[in-house]
């Protein structure tokens, strides 16, 4: 009798735990996908149709590690709530995701292991890197795209960025926005985002007072944008992306003072 009661209580606890996690179904799908990828990692040599003359005796190296992310891409969700964003990121048909979502109240939702590839960057480019999804961590901030970011939300972001930078040795220059890597189609995080505050903590670069800066006569602003990292397929979009990030300005064109800022960067 006691044994049956114990089984019943265990089953009840398990049912209660699952039934009270609103994401239990999608969490199960997540774990199933991880198992499938784990099987691929254990496959030696890789099964393919190349017809390679593989050695009869497989020799596996003892020197290996997991690939680590080298960029952090910051987004705003452009949705009305964290709940709406989490729903979007758990629907297979949307094909979009992010490693982290930070809600307005500072709550952090870690949706995907840092070492796995999220679908957050899309078609993008930064410097010579064209597949940002494969080399970055995506962080979505709960924000409708027009409002300011809450203090508690930014505090959580700073704590997270500090952990990521230390864990993966991410270079200071590689903390950027979605609007930087895809300026023709994205504008996030919006111009209210506190990039200067992040730069003061070594999550990105900033500029000094440009009052006494003198531009060289041969200064090429397009070449400078390219050096910073922008894709110049659409120069107007690249300029707006640069101004949004460093000048909190979304207008086109560059005046003399703005060129000085670009020169410093």
Language model features: what each stretch is:
Residues 1-25:
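Bacterial Sec-dependent N-terminal signal peptides
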Residues 6, 130-132, 258-259:
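Juxtamembrane/interface motifs at transmembrane-helix termini
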Residues 18-32, 150-233, 237-265:
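Basic/polar, cationic surfaces and motifs that engage anionic cell-wall
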Residues 26-170:
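Active-site-adjacent loop/helix surface patches within enzyme catalytic domains
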